[in-house]
Amino acid sequence: MHSVLAQAASGALSFELRLGQSSVLTICILALLTFVLREIVLYFTRHSMPPGPFRWPLIGNALQLPQDHPWVKYTEWAKMYGPLMQLDVLGQHMLVITSAQTARDLMEKRSSIYSDRPHLVMAGDLAGFGDTLILQNYGEEFRYQRKLVSHSFSPSVIHRYYDLQEAAARRLVLAIIEDPDSLENSTRLHIASIILRMTYGYTVKGVDDPLFTTGIAVINGFSEATRPGAWPVDFVPILQYVPHWVPGFVFTRKAREWRGVLERAMWAPYHWCKENYARDAAHGLCLCGSILAAEGSQLSSDQEWLFVNAAVTVMGGGLDTNISTILSFVLAMLRFPEVQKKAQAEIDAVIGPNRLPLISDRHSLPYVRSVVTEVYRWIPAVPLGIPHALRQDDHYDGLFLSKGSVVVPNVWGMLHDPSIYPAPHEFKPERYGGLDAEMTKVTDIAFGFGRRACPGFYFAEGTIFAIVATVLAICDVVPTVDEHGQEVIPEVSLTSGAIVSPENVKCAFRPRSGRVKDILVEAVETEQE
């Protein structure tokens, strides 16, 4: 009896094993057939898709994506595959545009379907940046936020910030004359002071001011959270549900830290302004004060949430990019001293020796304007722009562009196209001929496309011009010397990230005369009274 049962059990087990093996085999065959059919479909579809580097099955171009300075590789690839190429990363399509005309055709002329942002799990969902103006998808909330910000940045009202920008520029130049090694830190402090005063009416007390340090921390967090390819959770969203204590999954802890910093950066300066703007009419000139004066208690909680997210974007969007531009300007003056001399000669001829340049002098200084424009072109602060996302399937120049594709404007490649800008690695302000129409072609690329173009362009332009013109009027930017008395000219070495800047820019700022330094000191002391 036992043997019969054993035989029966053995037979049943054998049958189940065979059935299980058969099921596994069937699943494997079906999976293989699905993969083969997908590849066949993709093979024929790719003939109408943009070209690009060879894609490996399943992972696509994941192993080919450069981790450092990706804009350089994309520009090289564009020479082989054309100005519109496609990369695939774990099933996610990425369109890289290295032609200004193509970028305008898609992101401006078809802006209704090219104005979304890619969904970033790490930065948007986990770290909390998803509701900020810079990462919002295009829609009613985005339009509301942009309307709030754009009014304070429009050309018709931007002049009211000139005194603020000029005063900060003068304090900065005096600081770096006295301590050239503080160039980056002093630039960060004084540009932040402009932005916090303009946005919230708040005057920064110094480098330890909590509103300043929190603002810097949130910018650093955003830059890290949005670093392309840095976070596996952006490609495998289910990873966001893994507990933070699991080894190797520290990103959830980092995201919580950044979310906390973001909330402080959003609400602390807003509450300060809300408590103080009514007591000081000057606060009505700031973005926050003007909104509170106009809307006041009529702001709903949802509108208030959107506003504080828009306001914190002003801080984040204007600080690191402007610092990058100033460091690039200083590097250019060190490497191309003949440009510095020519710009100083124009200032001397137009402004004279008895006063400091003003932002309102800009239209009388075409060569200085050209210097600023060439800085934007030579080292664009955001070399790959801020990615867009394609809302629906599209066709362009006979190519099929699929819904959901991440659209990356290769700003670096566009502004270093030798067919448009000969000798692109040379710093040549003369290439614009002093013509605003030629300079605008650069700024239209460097400051974004279509409905996602930077709303703070005119404000940033005023800040940069004030600093550049003041440096040129007051100082000679000169190299440091080594132990042998030889000049040390810094190389063009850039950081790698969403926002880039020159590394190790060491120099001295030598007053052109005792007279101009006295004028500077007197101006700073008068403004502080």
From Swiss-Prot:
Pfam families linked: p450
Protein name: Cytochrome P450 monooxygenase 45
Transmembrane segments: 24-44
Family: Belongs to the cytochrome P450 family.
Residue numbers binding heme: 454
Top EC class of this enzyme: oxidoreductase
Keywords, in A-Z order: Glycoprotein, Heme, Iron, Membrane, Metal-binding, Monooxygenase, Oxidoreductase, Transmembrane, Transmembrane helix
Cofactor: heme
Subcellular location: Membrane
Residues bearing attached sugar chains per UniProt: 185, 322
